């Protein structure tokens, strides 16, 4: 069974892990990798021993377009020596929608101008991530080492006192969005109406925090429900 992170005496278990356990993709890395290891099989054998020797109990593969560990390295990394290692992956639901916008919607997202969380409210977002989760969940069905997905590693939530609209969730930023992102703008406008806020000039810190909370709740509720569906 999946007894990777359970203590038989019901004690606390600390996940002692590392992310992105895979060869790099830069030219310099590929050259050094070939010289040092020669093959992925040799690299994974040595890396697996290193993981086991340091009592690692969790790793991730970390591909942007989420995928399982390749067969050539899987055994060496997930069952080094006598140890079983668990893994989980980041679904990158928001980013993948953004990456595929040109193909699906005919235009690219201006990531340097707008907070990517505005894409939550695009009319096709929920349908898109439903298909994506269904596709990716099938990859891990029956995998005894796989313990689940995580969702929030991709989110631009952190910005000190909302100082940077592109790194936080800023109500004024949402209200100023162009017609192309009107779904997110209308979400912010409804928030203003529902809370009796007459103009941007009277938005308080509490209003900002309440709006941040609503957007975060919307993301987590939608994505969690979608993942649990499959």
What are these regions (language model features)?
Residues 1-80, 96-144, 202-204, 209, ...:
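Active-site-adjacent substrate/metal-binding segments within catalytic domains
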Residues 8, 102, 111-120, 138-230:
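Polysaccharide-binding and catalytic clefts of secreted carbohydrate-active enzymes
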Residues 16-17, 62, 88-90, 150-152:
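A cross-family glycoside hydrolase active-site/sugar-binding cleft signature
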Residues 58, 84-88, 144-150:
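Structural preference for beta-strand elements that scaffold enzyme active sites
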Residues 64, 92-96, 152-156:
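Active-site beta-loop-alpha junctions enriched in small/polar residues
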Residues 83-100, 175-182:
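Acidic, His- and aromatic-enriched active-site or binding-groove loops in soluble protein domains
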């Amino acid at each position: 069974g999946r007894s990777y992170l359970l203590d038989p005496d019901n004690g606390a278990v600390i996940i002692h892990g590392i992310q992105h356990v895979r060869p790099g993709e830069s030219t310099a890395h590929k050259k050094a990798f070939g010289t040092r290891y020669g093959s992925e099989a040799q690299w994974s054998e040595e890396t697996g021993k290193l993981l086991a020797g340091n009592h690692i109990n969790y790793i991730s593969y970390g591909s942007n377009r989420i995928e399982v560990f390749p067969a050539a390295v899987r055994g060496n990394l997930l069952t080094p020596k006598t140890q079983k290692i668990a893994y989980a992956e980041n679904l990158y639901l928001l980013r993948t929608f953004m990456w595929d916008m040109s193909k699906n919607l005919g235009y690219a997202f201006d990531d340097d101008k707008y907070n990517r969380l505005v894409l939550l409210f695009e009319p096709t977002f929920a349908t898109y991530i439903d298909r994506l989760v269904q596709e990716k969940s099938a990859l891990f069905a029956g995998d005894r080492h796989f313990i689940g997905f995580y969702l929030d590693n991709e989110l631009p939530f952190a910005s000190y006192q909302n100082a940077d609209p592109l790194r936080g969730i800023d109500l004024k930023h949402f209200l100023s969005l162009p017609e192309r992102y009107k779904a997110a703008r209308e979400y912010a406008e409804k928030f203003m109406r529902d809370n009796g806020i007459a103009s941007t000039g009277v938005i308080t810190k509490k209003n900002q925090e309440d709006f941040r909370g609503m957007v975060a709740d919307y993301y987590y509720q939608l994505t969690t429900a979608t993942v649990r569906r499959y």
